[in-house]
Amino acid sequence: MKEFFITGTDTDAGKTHVTSLLLKLLAQHKKQAIGFKPLASGCEMAFDQLVNADALILMESATVSAKYDIINPFAFAPAIAPHIAAEQAGVTITADKLSSAYKNVKQQGADYILTEGAGGWALPISNTDYLYNWVKAEQLPVILVVGMKLGCLNHALLTAAHMQSMGINCIGWIANQVDPNMDEYQANLDSLKLRLPFPILAISPYSEQTPKLQIYKTLLENFALNT
């Protein structure tokens, strides 16, 4: 079983988009893959339970089926930071609870588990703990999605520096253009290639529609076939 954690430089960096495409790429190569969205806020009621749109996308993209509460064990209605939403709901999120939920995912029989984080890298799960501590404890290799927009240099470099300080195994990063009108897009991309200490896996240009899977040819070569 191969396991990966997909994080982003910020909220809306494109984590779900990338995780979904990775799941589809693995499916193309006959791999049994499942997505895991441990924490989600901004959920809505459906079928008598809170569900998250991003988690549903991961379920639709996966080749291994599982019940919703296995894919997204912590779901909250307010579109706010999960640890604040959890406190309001009277729910305590701990690393042990996350690991217990993750064991349920491992029992689904997948060859690959792709865990999508929430928000950016430094996401609190409580007043005293962060999601990245759980990622380190589980020894998950990380893929960083850089949302290409104004401010991405600072966000990406700070994230990378923190990962390195923790000894996190970041296997690479993906440039995802979220702002179609970004000034000096190529110059920013070149700056990130020069400065980030991890290899670039793929570039996803901005599109009103979901980019074709061919965009991820490099990602396919680096991830789906060689991991």
From Swiss-Prot:
UniProt keyword annotations, A-Z: ATP-binding, Biotin biosynthesis, Cytoplasm, Ligase, Magnesium, Metal-binding, Nucleotide-binding
Signal peptide: none
Catalytic EC class: ligase
Protein name: ATP-dependent dethiobiotin synthetase BioD
Binding site for substrate: 41
Chain residues that bind Mg(2+): 16, 54, 116
Pathway(s) annotated for this protein in UniProt: Cofactor biosynthesis; biotin biosynthesis; biotin from 7,8-diaminononanoate: step 1/2
